[in-house]
Amino acid sequence: MLLYRFKHYIFEYIMENLEQILQYWEKDAEMDQTEPGKELIKIPTLHNKYLSILTKHKIASKKAHFDYLRGRKLKIEYYSGRMNQEELQAHGWEPFQFVLKSDINAYLEGDTDLIKMLEKKVYHEECVSVVESIMNELKNRNWELKSFIDWERFIGGQ
C-alpha cells in the first residue's frame, strides 16, 4: 500500500496543473508571422507536448473515477453498518449508527471524502477539455500558416 501511495504521489507531482497548462499555452500560442516556416516546423513538437499532457490527465481522470467507485462502495458498507471492527480501524473510522437504506444516498452525497474524489475527477476532466481545445487550435494553426504562406506567395508574385 505504501508503494502504491508513493507511485501515486510521484505521478501527481510530475503532472502539470491547469495553471501551468494555461501558462504553457500563453507562451506557445504566440506565432512569429515573419517566419511562418519555422512556426510550421514547431507544430509537431507542440502537438507532442500537449498530447503527453492530455494522456496524463485522461489517465488521472479515469483513476479518480475508479477511486471514487471504490470509495463509494466502502462508504455504502460503512453507512449501512456492514463494516466489521477491523475494517473500521483500517480506515480510521468510528462505528456509524445504522442508517435507513433510503437515507444512504443523502449521506453519500454529503460525504467529504467522496466529494474530494469527485473534485479530483472533475479537475482532471477540465484539464482534458482545455488541452483538447489547445490541440484543436494546433490543428487549425497548420492550415492557417499554410494559407498565410500561400497568400504571401501570391502577393509576392510567385
Predicted regions and their residues:
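Short, Lys/Arg-enriched N-terminal segments with co-localized hydrophobic residues
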Residues: L2-I14
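Charge-rich amphipathic alpha-helical interaction elements
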Residues: F11-Q158
